[in-house]
């Protein structure tokens, strides 16, 4: 029984569950998608909230440049490159034995400064927003001051009386731990069993308290939430429900618009943009997709990609039960080499907010992630962690889908030929060399 209903009844009502339960790579194109002008109201946030977040990051830029010299060249703005990957596109055509029309680009959040993953967006933003609230409330700064003042000894001593806590499979904890420690906060990261050892080691080297669990992500989050609940000096970064995290990710879209303009890429109904986003609990891809819908409206098509062993958002939105169901309820083990995506229960906030804005969801098995990892390195010389490759099959999934999605969305052959597909590479820039060599070895052995 699942939520009081026999499993057989679930399968009868939701036939795509059979593929999810069997761990077969599958896709579902959302029949409930609505015009963005209508569906954006579901989110409960708007363009003004994203603009406010962007302005906050600008205020903090002098401090970021001071604390992290690697950001000085960008003036303390944490942003990643956008690169066309034509050789990888050709390799995918051969790999999938398909034409795959359009152009293929890679958004390299994998190489964002400070923490080397997409979590450097939302995670760092939320800690900065919390620090700003505290600093303004206690008169350490004014809104028009130079925020680099927050690196001074008296401010650090003030922040040291406060703690930041978070539950994480790895990358969010890395981002929050590093920025929290840099500002002077005490920081606790509750790490699930999936977290890589090198990420724990790196956090400890920054003076962060790492609490390890033998169980999965949801337990780590719950324990972190519980620790923070009784302490007014602890701020818990709630990856399942946080508006601040969501907005930190959403800021990426306006910046991407500028990068696309600079590259001469048009985005409109005749030149659609497909963005393929790896999804764990949902905050990162949800926030980015929200920002993209604000920026490009119905000309952008956002799809979430998950491991076959951890399809929590696909499951939650497809059944309409969101965080009420976990993959484990259906006998799916939530064990994947894509550690950043090893989440069994999705964010209900993101699932409900975005359920009419996302074009679809698809799953990828671990072996395919490793093949794609090796293929990208072989064709382009770019190295990513397995999670970051989840969006790479997306161009093939869209091109070959049999569900009537392209016809329903008016995606004619001419429009697909003019399309830009963007794979959002979520992490991998800080993976130790020995670990990366092992990833590549596994991927090459599967390819050859």
From Swiss-Prot:
Modified residues (N6-(pyridoxal phosphate)lysine): 119
Gene Ontology MF term list: D-serine ammonia-lyase activity; hydro-lyase activity; pyridoxal phosphate binding
EC number: 4.3.1.18
Gene Ontology biological-process entries: D-serine catabolic process; isoleucine biosynthetic process
Pfam family, one: PALP
Keyword list, A-Z: Lyase, Pyridoxal phosphate
Primary enzyme class: lyase
Entry superkingdom: Bacteria
Catalytic activity: D-serine = pyruvate + NH4(+)
Cofactor(s) the record lists: pyridoxal 5'-phosphate
Alphabetized HAMAP family for the sequence: D_Ser_dehydrat (MF_01030)
Similarity comment: family membership: Belongs to the serine/threonine dehydratase family. DsdA subfamily.
Protein name per its UniProtKB record: Probable D-serine dehydratase
Lineage of source species: Bacteria, Pseudomonadati, Pseudomonadota, Gammaproteobacteria, Pseudomonadales
Gene: dsdA
